[in-house]
Amino acid sequence: MGLKVAINKKSFEKNGKSFFYLADTCWSAFTNINENDWKYYLQYRKRQGYNVLQINILPQWDASATDLNHSPYQKDEKGNYQFDKLNDSYFNHARSMCEVAKEYGFELALVVLWCNYVPATWANNMLSHNTMPYEEIDGYIKKVNETFTDLDPLYVISGDTDLNEEISCSYYLKASQLLHELAPNCLQSLHVRGRLMEIPEKLIKQMDFYMFQSGHNAKLENRAMPYCLPEYFIEHYPVKPLLNSEPCYEQMGYSSNMYGRFHQFEIRRAAWQSILTGAFAGITYGAAGIYSWHTYGKEFANEVGEGFDSPNPWHLAIHYPGAWDYSDIKVIFDNYEITELSSAQNLLMNGIDDIRAALTNNKLLLIYVPENTKIKLKLETTAIDKITIIDLETRHREVGTVSSCQGGCMVGMHIFEHDALYVVDLK
């Protein structure tokens, strides 16, 4: 059995038990990873607690160069895909990799049509030579269904797409409708472009859960995306499970060829801000060097896509510390038996949007504090049983202090050097 939407319509369950979607991003798996490296990767992420893999079914347009030669279609004399000539060997290979992943206990979130294959998207406008003809969608979707559906994947209909043009939307709508008919028990979503909020109603209706992308743009005006996006989805769309499927990746160069990279703190901040704003169905980790599967001595096309700087090889990227920070989110959810969150921003009196607060299903108040400060709450001290403060980098724990102040109470500063999660037990 695959994942199902829980009865609260806001999270997932599997076999009747709550399921926190903790994914790693491995878009280029089917084209770039050999068998031995695949098994090493799977066992390592499994040890870290990950339970979902996000993979692109077709070749990732900004994957790193590879010596492997896996092509989903036969090619013409110019090297372009002949979309009426599927390569069975490619899909057999992808199927085999998925079977191994399932043996390690992973769920599969498979992207059906990355935006470069769909006309009039931002990526297709940059690189249009492998645009899938509309009439070939049927044959491709049939092949996708035959190859993967009995593995109970999540089908992510789009990849990194904008939805500005009717022709683009028509591709995704057709693919979604076909898969709903062929694979009615497989949940569907869309993976949209960074910072995209507005999704056509006809596509919203097709989705079983929502993915948004706070993305990799480091401009100051975009720093609030991890909580602005879930706020928008919650306000404007019907209730469905919601998650940040592409926060900033660890060690990813800033987009638009801007100098700098995202580090452990930035990716942790994006995750906790999204989750405590209402995107608590799960979170996706990403590491530069893993999603493109970069190896020593191979090229990375900086000019393709959003203009990211070159990554480290996957051998280094797999050991980035932020992957443990994301796995610790699931540990916290499990340890505190958290299955649902509701925003508690109204309890904060600091007036700082970067600080996020949420109430759990079991009388806990969670507060994420990216920079150390006193926290003013619209609560009486008598409403609080105890406060545990977790240093999100070292996992050290501190017993918090609280005192009365005008209009409520004041939680004292912590003694750590990093961002922290306050777990407030309410009476």
Residue ranges with predicted function:
Residues 42, 98, 145, 176, ...:
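Short amphipathic alpha-helical segments and helix-helix/interface helices
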Residues 155, 159, 245, 390:
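Active-site flanking residues adjacent to catalytic metal/cofactor-binding acidic residues
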Residues 250-252, 267-399, 416-427:
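Aromatic- and carboxylate-lined catalytic core of secreted/periplasmic carbohydrate-active enzymes
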